[in-house]
């Protein structure tokens, strides 16, 4: 500390008890001290820049940076990253991850920079084995949520009024209901244009393996752009991708088969793999029968596909995934309702019945998915 600042601190701390804390002299001293300290800090940053002292890629503070968790960051940011991952906390930024001062203003943006700017990796952090050093509020929330803490966070940098929430917009997914619905509609349109061999017409396990391999690549691409995926960890993203593959291989194929099954019928012969044939017959007797009854159009199929994916996920995954799943279901259902109101002559009761019928179709999907998993294990398809 320089001599001028030291002397000023001594003068302020040595004020007599009789002096008023609001006196002009005291206030001027404090203002002068604040300006002096601010200039000292600015000068320090300038000197560090001139001397080419490296700055932390997360908080931009010139300091000693070292390898941590597969990346490079300062000790403070590395400790923040370790604590966030080990306690399984998921921060959600309310400002679309555009906070300027990531270190102090928003933990969600700070964690984002830990991953993207500093290259820190979740897999390098060990989970806490004992609750000895875990904060009480974390333990309490873990008991209620199954082990994962999801927190929305945005520290105020300036007193700004909260923006008015947009109608039909998900604050968590950061996307409107119409855009979310369009995402799934685009996936179905791609399947129609792809003109891949229909799964219900194949005969051999090799054909199924080829279709699954192609759909895995398409599902990976879809998951990269799927709203809310950036809020999930690596394992959760793998689960979502698995359900996308299932919906692409079996749900979309069954719907396409129902539209043109007279052109897709295969000849009766003995070249079928027996287990595959049994499962395809099961799909035809359940899902295909339902599609033939309800005659879903492409908009309804897109909504049904989304509902299937996230309803399957909802029952066996993390707290964060359940939150994202509910956001997807609410957004898609709202967009489908808006489609009926805008493009059909259905009244509110008819719309409610139709959406209920589409949602109830998911019941048959649970058993199909379970039997598909057994089939894949039997014939050696990675699952």
UniProtKB/Swiss-Prot annotation:
<dbReference type="InterPro" id="IPR013088">
    <property type="entry name" value="Znf_NHR/GATA"/>
</dbReference>
<keyword id="KW-0238">DNA-binding</keyword>
<dbReference type="GO" id="GO:0005634">
    <property type="term" value="C:nucleus"/>
</dbReference>
<dbReference type="GO" id="GO:0043565">
    <property type="term" value="F:sequence-specific DNA binding"/>
</dbReference>
<dbReference type="Pfam" id="PF00105">
    <property type="entry name" value="zf-C4"/>
</dbReference>
<feature type="zinc finger region" description="NR C4-type">
    <location>
        <begin position="56"/>
        <end position="77"/>
    </location>
</feature>
<feature type="domain" description="NR LBD">
    <location>
        <begin position="172"/>
        <end position="383"/>
    </location>
</feature>
<keyword id="KW-0479">Metal-binding</keyword>
<keyword id="KW-0862">Zinc</keyword>
<feature type="zinc finger region" description="NR C4-type">
    <location>
        <begin position="93"/>
        <end position="109"/>
    </location>
</feature>
<dbReference type="GO" id="GO:0003700">
    <property type="term" value="F:DNA-binding transcription factor activity"/>
</dbReference>
<comment type="similarity">
    <text>Belongs to the nuclear hormone receptor family.</text>
</comment>
<keyword id="KW-0539">Nucleus</keyword>
<keyword id="KW-0804">Transcription</keyword>
<dbReference type="Pfam" id="PF00104">
    <property type="entry name" value="Hormone_recep"/>
</dbReference>
<dbReference type="InterPro" id="IPR035500">
    <property type="entry name" value="NHR-like_dom_sf"/>
</dbReference>
<keyword id="KW-0675">Receptor</keyword>
<dbReference type="GO" id="GO:0008270">
    <property type="term" value="F:zinc ion binding"/>
</dbReference>
<comment type="function">
    <text>Orphan nuclear receptor.</text>
</comment>
<dbReference type="InterPro" id="IPR001628">
    <property type="entry name" value="Znf_hrmn_rcpt"/>
</dbReference>
<keyword id="KW-0805">Transcription regulation</keyword>
<keyword id="KW-0863">Zinc-finger</keyword>
<dbReference type="InterPro" id="IPR000536">
    <property type="entry name" value="Nucl_hrmn_rcpt_lig-bd"/>
</dbReference>
<feature type="DNA-binding region" description="Nuclear receptor">
    <location>
        <begin position="53"/>
        <end position="127"/>
    </location>
</feature>
<protein>
    <recommendedName>
        <fullName>Nuclear hormone receptor family member nhr-217</fullName>
    </recommendedName>
</protein>
